[in-house]
C-alpha cells in the first residue's frame, strides 16, 4: 500500500498538468518553430522553465487505483498486475479469463 502523501502528490501533479497544458503547448510550439526569431525562441524557453516542474506530464506516475502501487500497473484496467489477477480469479473483470493451452 502506497503512502497517502504519494497518492496525493500524484493527484496534485495531474491537476497542475491540466492547468498549464495550454501554456506549455503554446511555448513548445514557439520553441520548435524554425521561422521564429532566436530571441522569441529563447524567451519561450525561459518562460517554459519558469513553469512549475510538476506541471510537466512526464512527472506523473501510473498508480494502481486500489493500492497505489507504482510498478506493474496495467493501463487498460488502472490496476496493478496483482489486483488484476485477483479480480480476474473472482470473475470481476468481464471477458478476462486465465490462459490455458
From Swiss-Prot:
Q: Tell me the domain of life.
A: Bacteria
The record, for SUPFAM superfamilies, names: Glucocorticoid receptor-like (DNA-binding domain)
GO molecular function annotations of the record: rRNA binding; structural constituent of ribosome
Q: Which InterPro entries match?
A: Ribosomal_uS14 (IPR001209), Ribosomal_uS14_bac/plastid (IPR023036), Ribosomal_uS14_CS (IPR018271)
The UniProt entry's GO CC annotations, sorted and at most eight, read:
cytoplasm; small ribosomal subunit
GO annotations under biological process?
A: translation
**What's this protein's function?**
Binds 16S rRNA, required for the assembly of 30S particles and may also be responsible for determining the conformation of the 16S rRNA at the A site.
Protein name listed in UniProt: Small ribosomal subunit protein uS14
Organism field: Haemophilus influenzae (strain ATCC 51907 / DSM 11121 / KW20 / Rd)
Taxonomic lineage of the native organism: Bacteria, Pseudomonadati, Pseudomonadota, Gammaproteobacteria, Pasteurellales
Amino acid at each position: 500500500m502506497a503512502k497517502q502523501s504519494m497518492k496525493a502528490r500524484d493527484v496534485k501533479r495531474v491537476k497542475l498538468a491540466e492547468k498549464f497544458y495550454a501554456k506549455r503547448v503554446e511555448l513548445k510550439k514557439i520553441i520548435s518553430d524554425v521561422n521564429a526569431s532566436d530571441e522569441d525562441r529563447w524567451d519561450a524557453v525561459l518562460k517554459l522553465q519558469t513553469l512549475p516542474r510538476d506541471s510537466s506530464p512526464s512527472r506523473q506516475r501510473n498508480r494502481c487505483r486500489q493500492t497505489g502501487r507504482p510498478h506493474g500497473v496495467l493501463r487498460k484496467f488502472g490496476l496493478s498486475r496483482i489486483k488484476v489477477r485477483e479480480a480476474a480469479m473472482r470473475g470481476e473483470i468481464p471477458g478476462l479469463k486465465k490462459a490455458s493451452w
